[in-house]
Design a protein with these regions (language model features):
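Lipid interaction determinants
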Residues: 1-51, 58-118
Length: 118
């Protein structure tokens, strides 16, 4: 996602979550047709964006996302575990993944989310 990703992460009191993220500088398609775009534009859009949602549960310093819908279909029905840490003021949430294959390489992702609401 680069150094300046853009996205939203939402957890509800009812136990649902949704996360979406991509680079902040995603190129626009040549057309405004949502289902249009060249094969190259579509491939780049898919390769640079993550979106999934479902249920979540917290156990100690681990949050488990039970994926019910996802842009990446292989995640549907899986559990995505992330270690988390909250800043002292509760405004920053850091999520750390186990090793994941991204772009053909195995990586550990560390995402820092900033709270935007009260």
């Amino acid at each position: 996602m680069g150094e300046a990703p853009d996205g939203l992460l939402t957890y509800t009191a009812e136990g649902t979550m949704i996360g979406i993220m991509g680079p902040g500088d995603r190129p626009r398609f040549a057309t405004d047709d949502v289902t249009g775009g060249s094969a190259e534009e579509q491939a780049q859009a898919f390769a640079t964006f993550i979106a999934y949602g479902g249920r979540y549960a917290v156990d100690g310093d681990t949050v488990t996302h039970t994926v019910e819908t996802s842009l990446f279909p292989n995640w549907i029905g899986t559990e995505q575990r992330r270690r988390f840490a909250l800043s002292d003021d509760g405004r920053m949430l850091t999520l750390t993944s186990p090793p994941l294959v991204l772009g053909g390489a195995t990586r550990i992702q560390r995402l820092v989310w900033e709270r935007v609401g009260p």
